[in-house]
């Protein structure tokens, strides 16, 4: 419901090729409620909505704008891949059209009143640009607001040294939350001016502040936002926008009134019955002023009406007739694998030549972005490693301290020092080296240990055999004092293995 306040805003949602719907809405507002556009404090827009808002603020002919919408959609449909064909340059088409139709002082009319929704590439935040220093800045703001990544190109355009992309990514319907903002959208939902689909589904999807009801018609509209429909469908969308604009004006009592604040009668106390009768009479009066369905095209601008009628007429020249024949169409389809690379190469060459003036700035930006991405990846990897290594390293050190064997002269320190640093710091490799060191010790001990065991008889010590002494005289006094001589024998020591380890 439109609030009866002193100030109000108008906001147009982004919708791609469905922007022809806004041409019908804007034509209705200019014709039946010009004060609503002239006295609006701000007019906002995103993507295709920004083009419509710019046209309303600067006074561009809506008929020419609608004709351009249909012309661009027809050019896109001529190609095999539609708007994705390399020869179709949407950014170039928008810039050339705005250069042609915008007046030289358009930035003066737009500054402070026009708001264009943009998405900043560096942080993804939404930015609303409302001050423009020149006509070129106004055109560049519209180009940035309609630049869809990958769909329109890979390198985003810049405005005042900052890179921006489509404003619908971050905020597709600026200032929708304010009560004094008239929201316009080609998708049925909760916007003030939008199609009224007869659907029983109460569920809705809110995409970047845009209310979209779940139904088949909205799904069809979403599919045609980036891939334009047929001219007949565009004509019906323009008529639908005109009808929805009339419905909004009638519902809020703004139809054919110079100013809603001046046209309202003075307030006076009255009962509930009088209030109901007044509302019914106002509705009946407004409904009587609505044009019929068959005469809607008569109320559109003459240039737009002519463009819509021409779009529905099939050309009858000889070349078009031949190209529409089935054999010619089959031959054209079969030649696509051969003609498409040639067309792509030609289009790439033309775009490269047009890109040459901006090459230094774009290369510098790509270098900065590549460095930022690499730095982010390195910092993220460091955080992950720092989170896992401190928890595992103390346990690993403690296990090595407990399970280590006595050091030997032949250790693995030399081998570890010979390895790269990243291999020495790897825990799994350290475990493998420790196990290899243990196996090496066992092999060395088994190789150089010798069990030298001698029989006990070999270690028994015996006295050397002396020559037999001369028989002594038993009668001598020495023989009588000495007595019998005992046997000389030494007990054999226990046999012990002699361990000899070379170098151990």
From Swiss-Prot:
Active site: 47, 166
Domain PNPLA: 10-179
PROSITE patterns reported for this sequence: PNPLA
Record carries keyword Membrane: yes
Coiled coil: none
Residue spans, topological domain Cytoplasmic: 1-8, 64-137, 351-504
One of the GO biological process terms: positive regulation of triglyceride catabolic process
Record-linked PANTHER family: CALCIUM-INDEPENDENT PHOSPHOLIPASE A2 IPLA2 -RELATED (PTHR12406), PATATIN-LIKE PHOSPHOLIPASE DOMAIN-CONTAINING PROTEIN 2 (PTHR12406:SF29)
Protein name: Patatin-like phospholipase domain-containing protein 2
């Amino acid at each position: 419901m439109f609030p009866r306040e002193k100030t109000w805003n108008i906001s147009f949602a982004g919708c791609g090729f469905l922007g022809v719907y806004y041409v019908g809405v804007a034509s209705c507002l200019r014709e039946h409620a010009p004060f609503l556009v002239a006295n609006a404090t701000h007019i906002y827009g995103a993507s295709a909505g920004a083009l419509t808002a710019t046209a309303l603020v600067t006074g561009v002919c809506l008929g020419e704008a609608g004709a351009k919408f249909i012309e661009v959609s027809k050019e896109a449909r001529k190609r095999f891949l539609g708007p994705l064909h390399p020869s179709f340059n949407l950014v170039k088409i928008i810039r050339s059209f705005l250069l042609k139709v915008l007046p030289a002082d358009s930035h003066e009319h737009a500054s402070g009143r026009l708001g264009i929704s943009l998405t900043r590439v560096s942080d993804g935040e939404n930015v609303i640009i409302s001050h423009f220093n020149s006509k070129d800045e106004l055109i560049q703001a519209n180009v940035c607001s309609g630049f869809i990544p990958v769909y329109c190109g890979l390198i985003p355009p810049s405005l005042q040294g900052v890179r921006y992309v489509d404003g619908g990514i971050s905020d597709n319907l600026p200032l929708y939350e304010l009560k004094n903002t008239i929201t316009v959208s080609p998708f049925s939902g909760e916007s003030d001016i939008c199609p009224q689909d007869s659907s029983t589904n109460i569920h809705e999807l809110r995409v970047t502040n845009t209310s979209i009801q779940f139904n088949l018609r909205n799904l069809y509209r979403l599919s045609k936002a980036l891939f334009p429909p047929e001219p007949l469908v565009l004509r019906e969308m323009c008529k639908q926008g005109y009808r929805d604009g009339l419905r909004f004006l009638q519902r809020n009592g703004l139809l054919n009134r110079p100013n809603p604040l001046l046209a309202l009668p003075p307030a006076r106390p009255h009962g509930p019955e009088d209030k109901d009768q007044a509302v019914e009479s106002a509705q009946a009066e407004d409904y009587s002023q609505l044009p019929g369905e068959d005469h809607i095209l008569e109320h559109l601008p003459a240039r737009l009406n002519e463009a819509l009628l021409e779009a529905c007429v099939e050309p009858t020249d000889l070349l078009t007739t031949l190209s529409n024949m089935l054999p010619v169409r089959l031959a054209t389809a079969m030649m696509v694998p051969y003609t498409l690379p040639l067309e792509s190469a030609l289009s790439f060459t033309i775009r490269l030549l047009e890109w040459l003036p901006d090459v230094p700035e774009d290369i510098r930006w790509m270098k900065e972005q590549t460095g930022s991405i690499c730095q982010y990846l390195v910092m993220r990897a460091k955080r992950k490693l720092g989170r896992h290594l401190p928890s595992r390293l103390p346990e690993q050190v403690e296990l090595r301290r407990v399970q280590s064997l006595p050091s030997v002269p032949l250790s693995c320190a030399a081998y570890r020092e010979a390895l790269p640093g990243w291999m020495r710091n790897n825990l799994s490799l350290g475990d493998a080296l420790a196990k290899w060191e243990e196996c090496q010790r066992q092999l060395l001990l088994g190789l150089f240990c010798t069990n030298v065991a001698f029989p006990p008889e070999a270690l028994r010590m015996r006295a050397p055999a002396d020559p037999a002494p001369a028989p002594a005289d038993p009668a001598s006094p020495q023989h009588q004092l000495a007595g019998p001589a005992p046997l000389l024998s030494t007990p054999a020591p226990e046999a012990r293995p002699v361990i000899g380890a070379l170098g151990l």
